[in-house]
Structure formats: C-alpha cells, structure tokens
Regions:
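Preference for intrinsically disordered or flexible, low-complexity segments
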Residues: 2-249
C-alpha cells in the first residue's frame, strides 16, 4: 500500500485546519519521505480490517504462523499493523514488498504487567522483551485474524507536521521553558527516549506511540496512559524483524 504525495498533503491540510498552527514545528515536505526528520502522527477511526498503516484492528498474520504467546502463555495483543510498502516509501527502507510488519504486546486489563514490556537499558529487561513479552513479526499478508482476548479499535495513521526535536542548540537554562513533544511520531529521531545507548546498534528507530493516543478503553495498553512505545527495526530483518518496548517518563 502506497501513500501518495497528494494524500499526505491533504492530510496536512486537515491537520492544520483541526489543530491550528504550532510555532514549535515546521511544515513537512514529503517528497523524500521522513527518514531524515520526525513527523507527528495523529489518528482517525478506520475499519478493523483496513490495509492502511494503523493501530489495532485485525492482524494479517497468516494461519501457518502461530499467534504469538508470551513466556507466561498469554496471547499477545496486536498494537500495530504496518504495510512494508508504506515503511519503505516513508522511511526509505528496503523491506520485502507487499509484506506486513506486525507489532504485538503483552496486555492485561486486571493484572500488573508494566515491568514485562519496559526497557531502560538494562540487559535483563531487554532479555525479557526478546523472550516474547512483545513481538515484532515480518510476514506476508494472510486473512484477517485475531486470537487475543482484546481487539483494539483500528486507528489509521495521519501525518501531521515536522517536529523540531534538536535540543543540542538549546541552552540548559532555556530547557525548562521548552515544551518537549511527547506524542506519537514517525521518523529517525525519537522523543523522550531515556538512555541513548540502549545496546540496539543493529537496529534503527522507526516510530513511537503515545499510550494516550489509543482509543477509549485502551489508554492503559502500555499499563500507564503516559507510557510511550518505541519500535526499532532490525537492520538484519531476516532473523529478527525488530524490537518493541515501552518507557514511562
């Protein structure tokens, strides 16, 4: 699935109309994708079986691939469904065409699970996550499917504006006066990522999702509504598509 320049410009007009001008951000130029910038993501309702890049909805995981379970035997919940055509065009990647990158997480309404999906640089935390408390799968598109106990109402990605996340030129005394972006975004620079050296040298940043951006009833998908989920894609995706974890500031 490709997102055309015309469609992105239309999205931009909608964002400006609905959200107004933000003096802290600049307009996006989509000609060469967003691999050299970070762009805010806002969301709108879409069908659960939509082929568009989205939060939630049904998975396209083929029947010959087992639904992912965490080490406790719990079925994971689909967080993101991302067509590789979209990722390739938007981030200048070289993933297999006509595939889907599916991101799953541990989620329980009534039990504490924050520590199972959180990573702040500790090796044991990363080991937990890679053992299957979250899962990133690259696969061909199968029929729509859901085996989780939960189905998040699907939310389509809409590109907003380019974000200025470069704080290196800002004096320390001025940092307290700056409103740092803490929402959902896609691009090459994350926001509020704690501990820059996470030991993910073989991965590159793809996008982040703010817990409060999930639909009503699922603001606790990352346990806390102000948690942020970070998606990193593996440069050697043949054996390990990526890693997904959360942080809470």
């Amino acid at each position: 699935m490709d997102i055309t320049l015309e469609a992105l410009l239309e999205h931009q007009q909608i964002v400006q109309k609905n959200l107004g001008k933000n003096p802290k951000v600049k307009n996006v130029e989509y000609k060469d994708g967003v691999e050299k910038m970070s762009v805010e993501i806002i969301f709108k309702d879409v069908e659960n079986e939509s082929i568009k890049p989205r939060l939630g909805g049904y998975s396209f995981l083929p029947e010959n691939i087992d639904w992912p379970l965490n080490p406790n035997g719990d079925k994971l919940t689909l967080v993101l469904s991302l067509p590789t055509n979209f990722l390739n065009k938007t981030l200048n990647l070289n993933l297999p065409q006509e595939h889907v990158l599916s991101v799953f997480t541990t989620y329980k309404k009534d039990d504490y699970f924050l520590d199972l999906i959180t990573f702040h640089g500790d090796k044991e935390e990363l080991k937990n996550i890679k053992n299957g408390f979250t899962k990133v799968l690259l696969h061909e598109a199968g029929d729509i499917r859901n085996e989780s106990d939960y189905l998040i109402p699907a939310q389509e990605f809409i590109f907003g504006e380019e974000l200025n996340l470069d704080l290196e030129a800002v004096d320390d005394e001025d940092l307290d006066e700056i409103e740092i972006y803490c929402g959902s975004l896609i691009g090459n620079i994350p926001s509020l990522l704690q501990i820059e050296n996470l030991g993910l040298d073989d991965y590159h940043f793809c996008l982040q999702i703010y817990g409060g951006d999930f639909p009503e009833g699922f603001h606790d998908l990352f346990s806390l509504s102000d948690s942020i989920g970070y998606l990193f894609i593996n440069n050697n995706y043949d054996h390990d598509a990526g890693v997904f974890f959360t942080q809470c500031t």
